Amino acid sequence: MKLLKILMPLIILGIISIVNGYVIVIHPNTMNITNSSGVYNTDPNIIAYNVNDTITFEALAPDSVAQDILDNGVVKWDFGDLTETDYGNYRTTTHTYTFPFPYPVAWCGYLNNTGYSKALTYNWLVVGDVANTKYVFNGSPLNSKTSWEVYYNSTNNTVIIKYYSETPVDREFNGLSVDTTSVTVNVSRDEIVEGDTVKFNFSVSRNIIFCVWSFGDGTFSFEKFPEHTYTKSGLYYPRVLVVDDSGRVMVGYLDEGIEVKRARGGYIYWVTGPSHYDGEAYTYVYNSSGDDNNNNGNAYTDPYKITYKVNDTIKFEMSGAWGEYWKWDFGDGTETPYTYKSYFTPSYHQYKFPFMWPFFWMSYGWGSWWKSDTLNFIVVDDVENTRYNFYPSSAHDKTYYDYEYNKENHTVNLYYYSDVISTPKFNVKLRDGYYIDITATADKTQVSVNENVRFDCSPYGNPIFIMWCFGDGTCSFEKSPTHRYSSSGLYYPHVFVIDDNGNIEVGIPPPIGVGGYSSYPQIYASPTIAPTYYPINITIVEPASWTWYWHHIYFGDGGSVWIKPKKSPYTFTHTYTSEGVYPIYMKVYTAENMKTVYVIDNKNPIAKLYIYPNPASYKDTISFSPINSYDPDANRMIPEYNYYGTLIGYYPISPNSPMARIYGFNLTVYDSNGNVAWNYSSNELTIISKSFPIGNYTAKLVVWDGMGGVNSTTVKFSVINRPPVAQFIYYPDKPEPNEDVEFVSQSYDPEGEIAYYIWNFGDGTVINTTDTIVHHKYERPGYYTVTLTVFDKYNASSSISKQIVVGGILANFTYEIINENTVRFEDTSVVAPGKIISWHWDFGDGSTSTEQNPIHTYSKEGAYFVTLTVKSDTNLTDSVTKIVIISPPPKYPPVADFTYKVINGTTVEFNANLSYDEDGYIKYYIWDFGDGTPANTTTNPIIIHKYKKEGVYPVTLTVIDNDNLSDSRTKLINIGESFIHSVPIPPYIEILIVISTIFCFFQIIRGLK
């Protein structure tokens, strides 16, 4: 068969469809595609979508997440050629195709932080008569990598595609087919930031001769394994379209898409500057191009500007400070030496990896500035998108750290000594733009040269990295180090801490006076973040000589206290009754110092969970998105006071602070029996994905913030098996009786493979098979409804029915004898196409009829040859002859029965009126009264007989009908009272009793022997 020769190369284990101008539905209820006449078509035998037709695409929502995006978000279409829309209000759009081809069409979209992937929406749109078009694929390394040249000749149905290929390709196909085998798309990295180059590759078990990538940003590539640079942040869903060496067209999507993040960092987070103490001194920071970000303060800072980068030469400058000697501490373990003020010039420094480092300048002599007076932070490069891996070790040197910075992968590995943790901590994200002030102490603040000073700190969270800088250019990574200063001077130490939630913590102990230099009082508050009515521990640490001065402490809430500590350290408590930002200010003699406390009544975070798709296929990767969960405290305004307690404004709670940031989440998925099917935890809100078996599930999301607030939500979702789609064609389209008809399944399963097929050919023949091609012959012309039912491995099914016309005419009839010689004839002739318009009956007895269904009566018994001749409106004729036998009616015998009654003594009346004859009448009644008297024959059913003596008599009635057929009936009658309880036994019965008794006797004797 010609069709079979074309189809055989296309029969593979995957799902293949011969294609022609229709929609192949992979994801139902995701889109509506109509041609310019408003027609939506899934029938491959109808070419509804033509080249140059204006086709309308409408996005539909298969679940609630998609509905939210379509209603309130933005949508982007990928038409499967080299065309796609931007993100926008494109719920409905139009597109025109310029040559016949099977195109994968998909839409994607997003709302807030939640995206909807092309992998969840795509279907195939077959444009034009693809099955009957000749395709020439001409690949060359000389062709463009980013576009194709397509030549379409509609006269001879030829498409020539010229495209880039690493090796020359010259292949021809008579038609293309769609193969729903999945193509796996892979990318080279997880964390992608604008400006990053991403490597793509795909995998499929086919020999690919053509591929085209869509990167989702309007650019394309015909390389098999391209590299692409994303220049703008956003959500992108790449797609690859491939054709193999058998002309099978396949598509693959990156399920989760690519989130290209906006770089964030390269700015100054001002804590005490740039203006210090109302303009007494200033701090300035510039990059190597002279740009700043921003030396006017946090209100002007742009955290997305990336002004200060890795390996850039950054200039640090200050002005207006008191003191004779000045120095810089850059926070990364590097300091400048003290320089006399007349020679102090701007300092330059290079940072080697993205990080948020504290930096300070200090002075002493004729006035001094401490680290607590000048603390600010420089956020170097893209800290937001860098992941930090911490590798603590008790074997590492205690005085320095090592690092590895992988710019391409946005990772920093830190290797250092630790005595607080021993296991690595991976994928930590620093919370830039905020820090936590912690208590740091020294057991002595004035010592001799080389005298031991023991330092300690009280981290807010669980520390994973502790770095002490002692102010003399040396460091330690112990939590409570002991240090000796080798020369006299005034030293300003600090401790830098990172906790397991990525919080930056800094503690500044009092200055250390060495070799005759004096230290100064320092005040601390712990905790610096607390709810109302929580006792705040306030500690004064100072040299012994200062403990005898009166200290005036202002709490910022209008209250203050005078204290003469008389010892160091000295601790007392204070409680705040309302929310606010409160400075705790200490004035003692010529020294002053201040700490800030944030008092907030924490509001629990809001847990939000999006699950999509829902319902999902068992082949789908289900996305769980908690990223729209939020902490209502973020950016909430709380009062801010000066140290006198005067309201000076309102402070927006930083989204990166523990007060207003979700610190982590836990997702637990339960099956329908309540068993845990999956559990996942993270300290970062991120979309996670997983596939599940078919079933009903409940997902519970728990989120928590940095203040201990917890909230949860549950969402139900289901995983289903989408049924296969039944479709078939047959050849020839108008077969004749007994001609071989080839049926070809075009069915497909959007999730896998067809398990088996059931064909019902409409003529009583049904077959069950795993073959995609079957053959059948029809014996008679006519209209037959052929039904194909397909099943997948889960026994889900779908059916499609088509009518097949078997051409020709066939005369036939049935008949029924409705009484002795009358016959009803029924015409069962068929013709296709057309209809029968005349009937001629020859009944074989010289009679005829032109009725379609006549009734005829024969005059006598016999065998008759009945012939029916029919004629159609297409001038086809046919005849059929059958033998009709007219038989005499059957004769039924009579039925004998009677009753009797004793009239007087031994006189009995017998009544045979119960006897009857179905097809006639009874002529004679013959009575044998059982007393030896001669039989009595009569035509009267009633007769009287007198017995000579009492006794039991067998009375037999024989009846004879008009056809001389007979029947008999015998009854025992009892005559006389003396025989009521004693019935005489006939002699033959007595003989049988004697014989049986003798037989039993002998059997007993044999048993005894």
Curated annotation (Swiss-Prot):
Keywords: Cell membrane, Membrane, Repeat, Transmembrane, Transmembrane helix. Its main location: membrane. Residues 213-247, 436-503, 724-806, 822-886, 925-962 form the PKD domain. InterPro entries: Ig-like_fold (IPR013783), PIP_CTERM (IPR026495), PKD/Chitinase_dom (IPR022409), PKD_dom (IPR000601), PKD_dom_sf (IPR035986). GO terms for cellular component: plasma membrane. Pfam families: PKD (PF00801), PKD_4 (PF18911). It is found in: Cell membrane. It is a multi-pass membrane protein. SUPFAM superfamilies: PKD domain. It comes from the Archaea. The chain crosses the membrane at residues 6-26, 985-1005. PANTHER family: POLYCYSTIC KIDNEY DISEASE PROTEIN 1-LIKE 1 (PTHR46730:SF4), POLYCYSTIN-1 (PTHR46730). This is Uncharacterized protein MJ1468. It comes from Methanocaldococcus jannaschii (strain ATCC 43067 / DSM 2661 / JAL-1 / JCM 10045 / NBRC 100440).
